[in-house]
Amino acid sequence: MKHLALILSISLLLATYANAAPVVFIVRHAEKASADDKNPDLSVQGQKRADALAHILKDSQITSVFVTEFKRTQETAAPTARAGHVSPTVIPANDIGALVEKLRALNGNALVVGHGNTIPDLLKALGIATPVSIPEDDYTEIFAVFVGDAAQLLRLHYPF
């Protein structure tokens, strides 16, 4: 039921802005298996969150998926990319400028899976004035950014 409410919210949002600028959904990678490994896989909970993201975004007409060089971002995006038959584009985590350039050139909606320490800078670079911080243990945020002359932000949360 919680998934349904979120899906309906996103569908209404997309219908409202159908003729407007593309929507970029930005999420932090899902929970990782080990804090000790520099490039860990997702944990079981993280895999569940990645699957939930694909379900949440299934009607969002995602045409581009952007991930970093780290497995946790790639594994978080994989179910959504598979569902939309989209090959993810890898952009280095520290190259926000290159990512912003690609996002501003979009003709469709996109998913960006990043990191808690890079998403605030990405949002700022896209024109979101309100500062955002993501606690180290928070994997629940979904940022929907309407990329255009005046970027707008809608903050959503996973239902778990």
Where are these regions (language model features)?
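Sec/Tat signal peptide C-region and signal peptidase I cleavage site
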Residues: 16-20
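N-terminal hydrophobic targeting signals that begin at the initiator methionine
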Residues: 1-2
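Acidic/histidine-rich alpha-helical segments that form the ligand environment
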Residues: 109-111
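Bacterial N-terminal signal peptides
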Residues: 5-15
